[in-house]
Regions:
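Bacterial N-terminal signal peptides that target proteins for export
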Residues: 1-9
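Surface-exposed interaction/ligand-binding surfaces
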Residues: 23-148
């Protein structure tokens, strides 16, 4: 009888340990730095993901859209910021430039992840925004030089 109770407790502990070791879903954060720029200035769009070693994460690729007013300047490689046990903290940065004035609603950052046979989309909780302002050119306070 004692042997059966001991075996049951051992199996219960093994099941609890296996459940605790099961991979947690990845988490995602994103930010825009700076969030307010002048026309033609560059800004950094950063996505960070904390994931398990067995999970695969695909970061978005930005295509050319001349009507968007935002242009991709450089897509930097994925950085591994830290590794704690089975968890990896990854960062993907994009350098972008804005060529239209206004407030841009960039929406929620997204990344695809695969865990075993499951493919899903990760989305941030907050929506990102970028404010692009123009600079004033005051031609009345300066005399225009005419070489004629």
């Amino acid at each position: 009888m004692k042997h059966a109770i001991r075996l049951t407790l051992l199996l219960g502990a093994a099941l609890a340990a296996a459940t605790a070791l099961r991979a947690q879903p990845p988490t995602i954060w994103a930010r825009v730095e700076p969030d307010s720029i002048q026309i033609g200035d560059r800004f950094t769009y950063t996505i960070e993901v904390d994931r398990d070693l067995v999970q695969v994460v695909e970061f978005p690729e930005f295509g050319e859209d001349p009507d968007s007013g935002i242009e991709l300047v450089e897509s930097l490689p994925v950085d591994t910021l830290s590794r704690e046990g089975r968890r990896l903290h990854l960062r993907k940065r994009y350098v972008l430039a804005a060529f239209q004035e206004g407030r841009f609603h960039l929406g929620r950052a997204e990344a695809l992840y695969a865990d075993k046979n499951i493919v899903d989309t990760l989305r941030t909780d907050e929506e990102l925004q970028l404010f692009v302002s123009t600079f004033e050119i005051d031609s009345t306070s300066h005399t225009i030089f005419d070489p004629v």
